[in-house]
Swiss-Prot record:
Its EC number is 2.5.1.55. It comes from Rhodopseudomonas palustris (strain ATCC BAA-98 / CGA009). One of its GO terms (cellular component) is cytoplasm. This is 2-dehydro-3-deoxyphosphooctonate aldolase. GO terms for molecular function: 3-deoxy-8-phosphooctulonate synthase activity.
Length: 287
């Protein structure tokens, strides 16, 4: 490992800049990569919305949902099929792309076509995976495990910076509160900003997830996504992570907590208003 370096206070993915004191940016897209046509449909719609609103947007989707509740659940198209789709979205639509990785060997290949590698919450302490992601030189977004205290993320980030990569994002996505339930502690946002020094993202859709709550799949309460998103942005964050879908009720995964695409623009517009107020008066820069 290299000598530890400090995480960057702002990171740039394509034309999108994340920083706790900078204007709000968005990471958005469907839970999983369903098809090329579906991915391009959603990405095109999101680009139009972001352009109208004047906000930076990173497209996200998963080529493999490797931690589904049931072995029978749909997992996605896989990395081989995903890479040309990711490249098309990035190169032809001009949107930076984020996807999650689950195995060390996936990192270098995924990095060929995406701007941000995401470490899933369940894997956030897997040292070798963090190092493999860091070694690509891409931005690494680490989801805080539902089992971790926010101050524990300092050790997670230090694994990446010890590998010589200062481009880190940390994401809050709720903490376990009894069985099949997550809650959001808004104190975690400034705590992670202070402890890690990295830009902080709030995942508003997975925070309303009910893990395993439907027996063979996870449930969710999407009606609370706007509530938690407004609260997080009022605290002050670098960005929000929001999964969205044209027809969430028929999505292959995480439908109960995804925001319908038709409601996405109004939500982001409101969050931008909250963000402007929070950062105008914040003394914590922003968290």
């Amino acid at each position: 490992m290299n000598k530890s370096i400090a995480p960057a206070t702002s990171v740039v993915a394509g034309n999108v800049k994340f920083g706790n004191a900078l204007p709000l940016s968005v990471i958005a897209g469907p839970c999983q990569l369903e098809s090329r046509a579906h991915a391009l449909e959603v990405a095109s719609a999101l680009k139009e919305i972001a352009t109208r609103l004047g906000i930076g947007l990173v497209y996200k989707t998963s080529f493999d949902k490797a931690n589904r509740t049931s072995a029978a659940s749909a997992r996605g198209l896989g990395l081989d099929a995903a890479l040309p789709i990711f490249a098309e979205i990035r190169d032809h639509l001009g949107l930076p792309v984020l996807t999650d990785v689950h195995e060390n060997e996936q990192c270098a290949r995924a990095a060929e076509a995406v701007d941000i590698l995401q470490i899933p919450a369940f894997l956030c302490r897997q040292t070798d995976l963090l190092l493999a992601a860091a070694a690509t030189g891409r931005i690494v977004n680490v989801k805080k495990g539902q089992f971790l205290a926010p101050w524990d993320m300092g050790n997670v980030v230090s694994k990446i910076t010890h590998a010589g990569n200062s481009k880190v994002l940390v994401t809050e996505r709720g903490v376990s509160f009894g069985y099949n339930t997550l809650v959001s502690d808004m104190r975690a946002l400034p705590i992670m900003a202070k402890t890690t020094g990295a830009p902080v993202i709030f995942d508003a859709t997975h925070s309303v997830q009910q893990p395993g709550g439907k027996g063979t799949s996870s449930g969710g309460e999407r009606e609370y996504v706007p509530v938690l998103a407004r609260a997080a942005v009022a605290v002050g964050v670098a960005g929000v992570f929001i999964e969205t879908h044209p027809d969430p009720d028929h999505a292959p995964s995480d439908g109960p907590n995804m925001v319908p695409l038709r409601e996405f623009e109004a939500l982001i517009k409101t969050l931008m208003e909250f963000d402007a107020l929070a950062k105008k008066r914040s003394t914590v820069g922003a968290v």
